[in-house]
């Protein structure tokens, strides 16, 4: 989280500076990156700090105020993030955490309470966010559940392919929006791939994620 926030701060000056389209004797045309206003961040429970900081940090750096609401499974993350920014010296009133149910969230969006909405979560919930914002001209950014494929081609290193793709599918118990959800394997390698993948997964041990013996 610190690394991501620091990187975004480091690149902010270059990323936010005006883009000069034309500078001639007749015209100066430029694109200015101005704050949007109040950015509403709806963060998920998986990777709760990282997924939130991905929007919270750049929104604040760009001069916006931020309202954060977290998934019901990770409510305290929002409180702790606001506390951390406050202790770091962020002026009061620029970053707030709210506990909201789905109906209230959709009502605030539909009422035009925010200038931009960023949502990370399921496709179904993202559809409701989009519908709530319809007609308000509020910008909406949606990062929804993916259907990410993996491909194993003719010249693939089979052991490396198995290790990489199975890790991509199982990492964080598969609770990742960019996790591998299906794999396409060239016919010649298919049987060997399945056998190696099954053998690898059979070695996994389910259990308490805080215990080292758990895969």
Annotate the PLM regions.
Residues 116, 124-215:
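ALDH superfamily catalytic-core signature
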Residues 8, 88, 200-204:
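Short alpha-helical functional segments enriched in proximate histidine and acidic residues
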Residues 17-160:
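Rossmann-like NAD(P) dinucleotide-binding subdomain of oxidoreductase/dehydrogenase enzymes
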Residues 1, 20-26, 211-215:
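Short linear capping/connector segments at secondary-structure termini
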Residues 1-16:
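Long amphipathic alpha-helix in the N-terminal Rossmann-like dinucleotide-binding domain
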């Amino acid at each position: 989280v610190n690394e991501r926030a620091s990187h975004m701060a480091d690149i902010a000056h270059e990323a936010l500076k005006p883009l000069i389209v034309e500078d001639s004797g007749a015209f100066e045309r430029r694109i200015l990156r101005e704050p949007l206003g109040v950015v509403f961040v709806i963060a998920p429970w998986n990777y709760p700090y990282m997924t939130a900081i991905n929007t919270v940090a750049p929104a604040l750096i760009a001069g916006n105020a931020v309202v954060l609401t977290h998934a019901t499974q990770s409510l305290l993350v929002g409180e702790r993030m606001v506390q951390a920014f406050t202790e770091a010296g962020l002026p009061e009133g620029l970053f707030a955490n709210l506990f909201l149910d789905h109906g209230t969230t959709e009502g605030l969006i539909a009422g035009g309470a925010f200038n931009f909405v960023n949502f990370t979560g399921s496709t179904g919930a993202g559809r409701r966010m989009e519908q709530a914002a319809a007609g308000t001209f509020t910008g909406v950014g949606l990062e929804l559940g993916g259907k990410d494929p993996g491909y194993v081609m003719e010249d693939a290193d089979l052991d490396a392919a198995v290790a990489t793709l199975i890790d991509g599918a199982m990492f964080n118990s598969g609770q990742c929006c960019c996790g591998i959800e299906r794999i396409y394997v060239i016919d010649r390698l298919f049987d060997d791939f399945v056998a190696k993948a099954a053998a690898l997964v059979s070695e996994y041990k389910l259990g308490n994620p805080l215990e080292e013996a758990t895969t």
